[in-house]
């Protein structure tokens, strides 16, 4: 029997709000997008043109890395030998301040992912992108999409508005646990706070290395705030977190 290899983190790229997402937005947000000329909502965590954001041989002639389904299929399945892959769309919907706008855009992203990616290749699954700006709306999005078994986890950013163990997020974790959906905490920021504990860096690589601090803080928060005690069946996945910090972190946490 052939081994199953799952690429747990590939990134379909949203081409643009006024192009890619417009057909999937409701009438209100369609009008807002057009009248306000809202287009690119790429997170600064992953600038599309930065070499660090995509391999040179995975960049289409036109468009962002990850915007060409056939190129992504070739990279994930043919070149790397994966038998399955999970789509995690990292886009600015998780960073906007208007919670209703965030929810509308997250719905559109999830519907676009289902229609333009999952429906075209049975080897693809996806994470449900959540508007954590409003936990009640995040729960609604989980309930809306949980019956579609092509969605296998929920996606949140490592650096959001506050620590993920706080009680106002508990309804989200309860819904995820109820539907057996792991919480995928992915590298990235909503830029509400500095990425380091003592302020803002000057350079991209400082930010990149500082992300380990965010993951450490989130792990501590989930444990010490009692999330796993309240929801013992909840599973959490750290995406693009690195692992080299974990042994020293575990030693210090246990020692304390």
Language-model features: locations:
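Helix-coil boundary/capping segments in enzymes
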Residues: 1-256
